[in-house]
């Protein structure tokens, strides 16, 4: 019985943690999903962005008290403007997606929303990109990856 309880907690912790991508695995996935060069943004810039936003973690969340909103998933997409979490006041839901879908291990919906955001606002919509990637050599983010 104890073994079943421990096993249950183990599965629960894996489900809560989500998927943390390895850098090159994420590079290949983002390329496959069409982000390399999308709206002029290089794959290396997307990798830099996701490193600083979520450390490549699909389940990352960050609550923003000032706007009463939360950033979700590998791209840290905000519930005030882009997704619906059912609790953010006056949310816009610009991507027409549930915020929980942005935290799935299959990141296709998160990528689709990121494409929508970059199409409307550019890569500068992400504060982490402006702080850590803009005007930096980001080539190391894809260095050594077989793409």
Curated annotation (Swiss-Prot):
Domain C-type lysozyme, first and last residues per copy: 19-147
Active site: 53, 71
Function according to Swiss-Prot or TrEMBL: Lysozymes have primarily a bacteriolytic function; those in tissues and body fluids are associated with the monocyte-macrophage system and enhance the activity of immunoagents.
Gene3D superfamilies: 1.10.530.10
EC number, as in UniProt: 3.2.1.17
Coiled coil: none
Single Gene Ontology BP annotation: digestion
Keyword terms of this UniProt record: Antimicrobial, Bacteriolytic enzyme, Digestion, Disulfide bond, Glycosidase, Hydrolase, Signal
Tissues with expression: Stomach-specific.
Positions of disulphide bridges: 24-145, 48-133, 83-99, 95-113
Segment forming the signal sequence: 1-18
Domain of life: Eukaryota
Pfam families in the cross-refs: Lys
Organism whose genome encodes this protein: Bos taurus
Family according to the record: Belongs to the glycosyl hydrolase 22 family.
Subunit structure: Monomer.
Other facts noted in the record for this chain: Lysozyme C is capable of both hydrolysis and transglycosylation; it also shows a slight esterase activity. It acts rapidly on both peptide-substituted and unsubstituted peptidoglycan, and slowly on chitin oligosaccharides.
Protein name: Lysozyme C-3
GO molecular function: lysozyme activity
InterPro entries associated with the record: Glyco_hydro_22, Glyco_hydro_22_CS, Glyco_hydro_22_lys, Lysozyme-like_dom_sf
């Amino acid at each position: 019985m104890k073994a079943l309880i421990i096993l249950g907690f183990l599965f629960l912790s894996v489900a809560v943690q989500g998927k943390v991508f390895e850098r090159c695995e994420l590079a290949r996935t983002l390329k496959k999903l069409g982000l390399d060069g999308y709206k002029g943004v290089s794959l290396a810039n997307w990798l830099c962005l996701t490193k600083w936003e979520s450390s490549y973690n699909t389940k990352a969340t960050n609550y923003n008290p000032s706007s009463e909103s939360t950033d979700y998933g590998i791209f840290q997409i905000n519930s005030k403007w882009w997704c619906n979490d059912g609790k953010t006041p006056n949310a816009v839901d610009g991507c027409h997606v549930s915020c929980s879908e942005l935290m799935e291990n299959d990141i296709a919906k998160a990528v689709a929303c990121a494409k929508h955001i970059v199409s409307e606002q550019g890569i500068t919509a992400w504060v982490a990109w402006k702080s850590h990637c803009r005007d930096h050599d980001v080539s190391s983010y894809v260095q050594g990856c077989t793409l």
